[in-house]
């Protein structure tokens, strides 16, 4: 039963990290790709906390699989964050840009135009438009962080002591 529950920590970390990233973008207006590293950390720690009772500390082959799982969940968390960013923030930001370019444009008209522009593209196109090359770099670092947290025995021991496991 414990082995079935083990990946839930990574999934919860990915979802929580993605939501927090999208909210950060909504609150500040900055994409802040470096927050992806936090998604990797949340995913790795979540995976580690839920796996701690199911896998022996020195079972390297099992921890390697857990580390790959954490890396996959980190990627999923980044996509969740980008998807929610588009869902929550694309139309208001397009409307703000329209009003900045056309000072006489009313907010209702700008939102209507923004919704038309938004509906003309797929979510994937909007996600690509809202990503920079630095986001890819931070995404790779996030994947490494998630992998490293779960695979490195010293980090595991620190988390175990903090989490009260083993």
Question: Would you name each region that the model predicts?
Answer:
Residues 42, 48-166:
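Core subunits and conserved enzymes of cellular information-processing
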Residues 1-43:
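Transmembrane alpha-helical insertion/packing segments
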């Amino acid at each position: 039963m414990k082995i079935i529950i083990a990946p839930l920590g990574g999934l919860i970390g990915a979802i929580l990290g993605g939501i927090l990233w999208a909210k950060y973008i909504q609150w500040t207006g900055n994409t802040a790709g470096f927050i992806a590293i936090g998604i990797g950390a949340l995913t790795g720690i979540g995976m580690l906390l839920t796996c701690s009772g199911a896998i022996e500390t020195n079972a390297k082959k099992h921890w390697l699989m857990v580390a790959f799982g954490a890396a996959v969940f980190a990627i999923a968390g980044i996509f969740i964050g980008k998807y929610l960013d588009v869902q929550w923030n694309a139309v208001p930001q397009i409307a703000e840009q329209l009003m900045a370019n056309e000072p006489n444009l009313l907010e209702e008209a700008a939102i209507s135009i923004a919704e038309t522009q938004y509906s003309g593209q797929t979510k994937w196109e909007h996600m690509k438009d809202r990503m920079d090359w630095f986001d890819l770099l931070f995404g790779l670092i996030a994947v490494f962080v998630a992998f490293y947290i779960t695979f490195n025995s010293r980090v595991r021991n620190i988390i175990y002591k903090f989490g009260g496991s083993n």
